[in-house]
A protein has these predicted regions:
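Glycine-rich ATP phosphate-binding loop
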Residues: 140, 150-157
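Conserved ATP-binding/catalytic core of the eukaryotic-like protein kinase fold
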Residues: 150, 160-165
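N-terminal accessory/targeting segments that precede structured cores
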Residues: 1-137, 143, 163-194, 198
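Residue-level signature of catalytic and energy-coupling elements of molecular machines
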Residues: 74, 138, 154, 210, ...
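An acidic- and aromatic-residue-enriched active-site/binding cleft used to recognize and process polar
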Residues: 157-161, 237
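ATP-dependent phospho-/nucleotidyl transfer catalytic cores
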Residues: 86, 92-100, 112-113, 166-167, ...
Length: 261
């Protein structure tokens, strides 16, 4: 119970920091009691985000700070303008899943534990992280196929991320069950949102699902010359490690570059 309260307290204080409590206050019946309650838990001296920051951006910033489960929750909520409104949904649609990377040495430790082999017997030129998100991060490396050297990207789950997610989801279940006792929160269907978030994250915590989906997509599009799916190197895939062919390209959100090319 104490751990759940501390979890709730953390959420309140982060929401206060980004002025999100004001948005909640607008939509509840007992505004004065809510204001007193949140003031006691999160004093006015807490830092706040700029008041002219769009609501969706403030919500996204808070979710990023709260952790991986909240980031995934925000990405799901952003697809429901019927619940949060079009303007907030549009602002949250670009919610970035970016976090500081964990060290190369930690990544090597995870790989060696997964394959029970030394890193040098698996990969050549295993580099520093080039992209990091809430669930996993990516390193460039090379593998050897006979005399051929193949550039690859290696995706690795964050250390302890499975335990972290399970703990966060347990506490989110507790919180949503508590909030749905209040009529103001019933229409948000929080329990169904949390259930869907849990399903999405479950697949992301086992990289073999992603590898299988990529392999199936490659098979289904093999006759389409305008579409290319990188190869999955299955001998270098485990629950926590995914190895995929490295290719050059333009990110889908770089519209100007795509038009130029």
């Amino acid at each position: 119970m104490i751990a759940n309260f501390l979890f709730f307290l953390k959420i309140i204080r982060v929401f206060k920091k980004y002025n999100i409590l004001i948005l909640i206050e607008k939509n509840i019946r007992y505004k004065f009691l809510f204001k007193i309650f949140t003031y006691l838990l999160a004093p006015a001296t807490f830092n706040k985000s700029p008041k002219d920051m769009p609501d969706g951006i403030r919500i996204s910033s808070a979710l990023n700070e709260l952790g991986p489960s909240f980031i995934k929750l925000g990405q799901l909520i952003s697809t429901r303008p019927d619940i949060i409104g079009n303007e907030i949904a549009e602002d949250m649609a670009m919610l970035r899943d970016n976090l500081p990377p964990f060290s190369r040495n930690e990544a090597i430790k995870i790989i060696e534990e997964q394959f029970d082999k030394d890193i040098d017997s698996l990969f050549q030129n295993f580099g520093e992280p080039i992209a990091a998100a809430s669930i996993a991060q990516v390193h460039f490396a090379e593998i050897k196929d006979g005399q051929k050297i193949i550039p690859v990207a290696v995706k690795i789950l964050r250390p302890n991320i499975i335990e972290t997610i399970e703990d966060e989801m347990y506490r989110l279940d507790w919180l949503t069950n508590f909030l749905e006792n209040f009529s103001e929160f019933e229409r948000l269907q929080l329990n169904s949102v949390i259930k869907k978030t849990r399903e999405i994250i479950r697949f992301e915590l086992d990289l073999r699902y992603e590898a299988a989906a990529a392999s199936e997509l490659k098979e289904n599009t093999k006759d389409d010359q305008s579409f290319y799916v990188p190869d999955i190197h299955w001998e270098y895939v485990t629950k926590k490690v995914l190895t995929i062919e490295r290719i050059n390209g333009i990110p889908a959100d770089k519209i100007d570059q795509l038009i130029e090319n």
